[in-house]
């Protein structure tokens, strides 16, 4: 009986962990927060302000895309990190 209860709890915990990883929450990112999250997603840095990361925000460092831009996709409506990653340079 005890083994069955432990096994049941283990299955529930694993399934909850797996499902939470699959369901990333879409969020809105605007202004400085959008710049900071792009720096983190694309370059693995936390932008502290100032000019030390300014070259990263030049157009040559971001992938050019046709259609809506990152502000349209992630500020005006919620987006997931995968959308933000699609704007990183290759």
Curated annotation (Swiss-Prot):
Note the subunit structure: Heterodimer of a B chain and an A chain linked by two disulfide bonds.
Q: Supply the alphabetized keyword list.
A: Cleavage on pair of basic residues, Disulfide bond, Hormone, Secreted, Signal
Query: Where in the sequence is the signal peptide annotated?
Result: 1-20
Q: What does this protein do?
A: Brain peptide responsible for activation of prothoracic glands to produce ecdysone in insects.
SUPFAM superfamilies xref list: Insulin-like
Which residue numbers fall in the propeptide? 49-64
Q: Does the keyword GTP-binding apply?
A: no
Kindly give any further remark recorded in the entry: Silk worm has two kinds of PTTH: 4K-PTTH and 22K-PTTH; there are many forms of 4K-PTTH.
Any matching Pfam family? Insulin
Please provide the Gene Ontology terms (biological process) for this protein.
Answer: cell population proliferation; insulin-like growth factor receptor signaling pathway; negative regulation of apoptotic process; positive regulation of cell population proliferation; positive regulation of phosphatidylinositol 3-kinase/protein kinase B signal transduction
Please report which protein family the annotation says this sequence is part of: Belongs to the insulin family.
Where it sits in the cell: the answer is: Secreted
Which cysteines are cross-linked by disulfides?
30-75, 42-88, 74-79
- What lineage, starting at the top, does this entry show? Eukaryota, Metazoa, Ecdysozoa, Arthropoda, Hexapoda
Q: Which InterPro entries match?
A: Bombyxin (IPR017097), Bombyxin_B (IPR027285), Insulin-like (IPR016179), Insulin-like_sf (IPR036438), Insulin_CS (IPR022353), Insulin_family (IPR022352)
What name has this protein been given in UniProt? Answer: Bombyxin B-5
Q: Which organism is it from?
A: Bombyx mori (Silk moth)
Q: Name one GO cellular component term.
A: extracellular space
Where the protein is mainly located, per its record?
secreted
Show the GO MF annotations: growth factor activity; hormone activity; insulin-like growth factor receptor binding
């Amino acid at each position: 009986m005890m083994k069955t209860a432990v096994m049941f709890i283990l299955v529930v915990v694993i399934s909850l962990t797996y499902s939470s990883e699959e369901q990333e929450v879409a969020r809105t990112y605007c202004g400085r927060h959008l710049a900071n999250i792009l720096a983190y997603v694309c370059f693995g840095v936390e932008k502290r302000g100032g000019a030390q990361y300014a070259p990263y925000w030049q157009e040559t460092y971001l992938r050019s895309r046709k259609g809506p831009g990152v502000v349209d996709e992630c500020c005006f409506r919620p987006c997931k990190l995968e959308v933000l990653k699609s704007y990183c340079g290759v």
